[in-house]
C-alpha cells in the first residue's frame, strides 16, 4: 500500500510524515494542532533499533487516520476505537480483495 503524503478531512489538510523513530517506542502519532500524522519506520528497544514491518506501518497509518477522524468528528481520541477499527479495516481490505494503491 502506498501511504499518502497528504489528504483532506473535514476541509482540513492532513499531512503524513515517515520518521525514523518516535519517542516512547511509539509506532505513530496524530497531532490535532498541526494536523500531522507521523509514522515511525523503526522503534528503539533498550537502545536497539528495530525496523518495523510494512504491515505494522500500514496498521499504524490506519490507527492514526482513525484518530484524525475521531478528532474532527467529536474532538476526542479513543485508543480502543482506533485499535479495533484499524484491525477491522485491514481485515476487510485483505479478505475482500479490495486493492488500495
For each feature predicted by the language model, list its residue ranges.
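Short active-site segment of divalent metal-dependent hydrolases/proteases
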Residues: 62, 66-70
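Catalytic zinc-binding patch centered on the HExxH motif and its immediate surroundings
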Residues: 2-10, 17-40, 46-48
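Short pre-active-site segment immediately N-terminal to the catalytic Zn-binding motif
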Residues: 37-60, 72-73
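Post-HExxH zinc-binding segment in Zn-dependent metallohydrolases
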Residues: 73-101
Amino acid at each position: 500500500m502506498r501511504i499518502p503524503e497528504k489528504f483532506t478531512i473535514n476541509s482540513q489538510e492532513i499531512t503524513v510524515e515517515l520518521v525514523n523513530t518516535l519517542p516512547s517506542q511509539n509506532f505513530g502519532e496524530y497531532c490535532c494542532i498541526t494536523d500531522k500524522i507521523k509514522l515511525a519506520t523503526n522503534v528503539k528497544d533498550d537502545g536497539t533499533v528495530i525496523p518495523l514491518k510494512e504491515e505494522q506501518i500500514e496498521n499504524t497509518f490506519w490507527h492514526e487516520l482513525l484518530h484524525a477522524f475521531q478528532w474532527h468528528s467529536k474532538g476526542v481520541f479513543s485508543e480502543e476505537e482506533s485499535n479495533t477499527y484499524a484491525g477491522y479495516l485491514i481485515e476487510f481490505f485483505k479478505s475482500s480483495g479490495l486493492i488500495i494503491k
